[in-house]
Amino acid sequence: MLTLSYQGVDGGFYQCATSLDASLHLEPVVSSVDPNGAFFAFEADLPSVVDPYTLFTEEEVSALVYDSATPLSLSDGDQLTSLLSALAFSDQNQAPVNDGYTYVDGEDTLRVLQGGSVVYHSSGEGRYTAQPGLSGAVEAAWVLANAAAAPLAGQARLYLLSAQADADQKDHYTVIFGYCLNGSAVHLYDDGWAAVFEVTEGVVTDFTIRLRSYSAAPQQALLLPAEKAAAALTALTQDSRELSVQYRDNGDGQAVPYWNAT
């Protein structure tokens, strides 16, 4: 019996002869599996940009629809107190603004806005410190994002969307988180993210967190079979070759699933 391996770096397949007997090892495993029509992209007439080892089925795909909402009410004093406590921010110097409240604590400013955005800026030494390096920046940002957003997110979870070091400014990092629903990313509003943090020289200097809450709706949405979606999806390119189901939340009360190229 031969063992096969695939190296994603160079796209090559490799084989190695073994003393194993297929009738003893492989056949018992596959004997209970019935073919279901699944096939690889390279076996079908699909755009060449599709990853050739993407596995397709001819079945329609269904996914849950989620109700979405802004979970924070500015008229709910308990909610505001809980949020400020989660961010270790004082509520002593509160000032109303057109679309929410501004809290000032020393050289730090926190704005809580009607649409669910929480915006922080420090013009001084900053209250939120981070360990050195990119991993330290991610950890500090995660603690704040999780403390503020996770208790209000319902069935959504936060995940790390990106983390980058600034090429021009030393010790400056940008960390971005997104929401996900049942393992599928949520594209929130126009730019997709749930929270973005700026960390400079071991201090969180700025962040914006968009508070959203998600709960499963009673209906499901039917999506095109993956093969048809691949043929129709113009977003598939050499740099984005894999299909995945994601959710779009435009702020209109529902997060709906759709095919996307990643």
Q: What do these predicted regions represent?
A:
Residues 1-136, 143-147:
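Preferential activation on post-signal-peptide N-terminal prodomains/segments
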Residues 75-83, 128-169, 216-254:
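Short, non-transmembrane alpha-helical segments in secretory-pathway proteins
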Residues 1, 75-122, 154-201, 209, ...:
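Exposed beta-strand-loop-beta-strand "reactive/processing" segments of non-cytosolic proteins
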Residues 21-22, 183, 225:
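Helix N-terminus capping/helix-initiation residues
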Residues 192-228:
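C-terminal, well-structured catalytic/ligand-binding subdomain of enzymes
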